Amino acid sequence: MSYKRVFVIVMDSVGTGAAHDAAKFDDVGSDTLGHVGEYYKGALKLPNLGKLGISNLRDTPIEGVPVADPAIGDYGKMEEISAGKDSMDGHWEMMGLPVMKPLSTFPNGFPQEIVDKLEKFSGRKVIVNKPYSGTEVIHDYGERQMETGELILYTSGDSVMQIAAHEDVIPVEELYKICEYARTLVNGPEYTVGRIIARPYVGPDKDHFTRTANRHDFSLKPIGETDMDRLRAAGYDVIGVGKINDIFSGEGIDKGYHNESNMDGMDHVDEVMKQDFTGFCFTNLVDFDAMYGHRRNPKGFGQALMDFDKRLGNVLDEMKPDDLLMITADHGNDPGFKGTDHTRENVPLLVYSPSMNKPNQSLGVRKTFSDLGATILENFNVEPVKGTSFYKEISND
């Protein structure tokens, strides 16, 4: 008997130790979960993730989270083969579409020809145009932007173009139109950017600016068929919660839910769990990354993990025998590490169903995130194209 509903929850940026190729990214020593645990000195309480095996899959347990003996599910880690360490790379690879050619990055800012086109289209001047922390850039330039109506253009170590503007100065819909236009400028072949991100903010002055939930990602369209496309073609339902819709440009998705926050995202998961469908629900919870990882805030990161863990308890309670849950991440963003960028890490893989035959077994280190998608496809009798399925290990047959 295969599983009727498969739920995947991506804890955005919750890595579990430096990947084998971390040196290429200058990320040796990164360990998001490990360093958050160290910061909490034993006070990080994750009972539900713990009983699923979040410490079992690590070489050393997370401080405060004992190894489960036995774990109620199966556990392992996944390595990324994509060229980058952005959300897009990670999610696409999970769905059988690893990004093997590095996308364009802009350590010195965007070329003048792109800036000129943005200024001409928007009728607004562009300022900053260099790598910057998103919270620091509005602190340093937000008041000026309010006075002048300019566009704050910045990037990071990833293949992203970010445009920030105060919502009272440039309405959100106008900012989206500018970002949609920017998307057309960097779809290749000369420049290929993974994501254009609209970054609206509010507040009276630099000490009180906050970025709003009206953030919107304009992703590169998937450059090939994904496992979600394959599931839909086979007649299964595909539901996206959070920025899944943005990451895949709406492709391969029947219904999408926009999240205001992690807790709002878990409300959506609870809502979807009440629905009768046959297929796949793919959820991204971005607060770990956006609110705490980039800001190098281990305290907030740990609290977000504990808040998620509480909500996870309800998901486990509500699961039907023919439901399958997989929890993972798309990359790391170690709040105890240097810089403000993502970190190249292995990601956790936690798998649970009330009816699984062999809980408490290690799934090992998977050699690509695509193993996750391949497993979902095999469950639904669809031929996997990329990755090695671990369906037989986790099945209820």
From Swiss-Prot:
Pathway: Carbohydrate degradation; 2-deoxy-D-ribose 1-phosphate degradation; D-glyceraldehyde 3-phosphate and acetaldehyde from 2-deoxy-alpha-D-ribose 1-phosphate: step 1/2. Keywords: Cytoplasm, Isomerase, Manganese, Metal-binding. It catalyses: 2-deoxy-alpha-D-ribose 1-phosphate = 2-deoxy-D-ribose 5-phosphate; alpha-D-ribose 1-phosphate = D-ribose 5-phosphate. It is found in: Cytoplasm. Its cofactor is Mn(2+). Coiled coil: none annotated. The keyword Isomerase applies. One of its GO terms (cellular component) is cytosol. Binds 2 manganese ions. Mn(2+) 2 binds at residues 289, 294, 342. Pfam families: Metalloenzyme. InterPro entries: Alkaline_phosphatase_core_sf, DeoB, Metalloenzyme, Phosphopentomutase_DeoB_cap_sf. One of its GO terms (molecular function) is phosphopentomutase activity. It is an enzyme of class 5 (isomerase). Its main location: cytoplasm. CDD domains: PPM. One of its GO terms (biological process) is metabolic compound salvage. HAMAP family: Phosphopentomut. PANTHER family: PHOSPHOPENTOMUTASE. Belongs to the phosphopentomutase family. This is Phosphopentomutase. It comes from Limosilactobacillus reuteri (strain DSM 20016) (Lactobacillus reuteri). The gene is deoB.
